[in-house]
Amino acid sequence: MYVFFASILMNFYTATTEMTLTSNRYTLVPSTNVGDSFSGKNAYADLTATVTFEDGVRTSMQTDSRVSFSISDGCGTFANSGNHKRLTIDSACRTSSVTVTAVLTLGSSTVEASRTFSIEWLQSLSVQLFYQDASTAFSST
């Protein structure tokens, strides 16, 4: 008489119901634009993709390989940065806004989220100098 035992390891997922995409900033400048040197202007943003499952569980999945990211106009790149997905705006980006989309597919369940980011370019800079009295403009030839 022979007795056989078999075991199967199966991963079960509850269906996903929604995804939200958030960021630490929503206004960016291209990576080589001089505006990146000014306070509060950055060429990158750290993204968080929070997924809600059918059972109510919410989890951040932005660095999970099953979540894919895309950006309109090919204006940026994505890379893992600690617990975030870092979006960096490409120096060749010549638009006033971009849309970032994250998509997660688990089994037959797919959720996606999109977020719009404003792009600013420093195109000109005007500097006016004054003497110490703060009322007489300095002029030089």
Task: For each feature predicted by the language model, list its residue ranges.
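Extracytoplasmic soluble-region selector
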Residues: 1-141
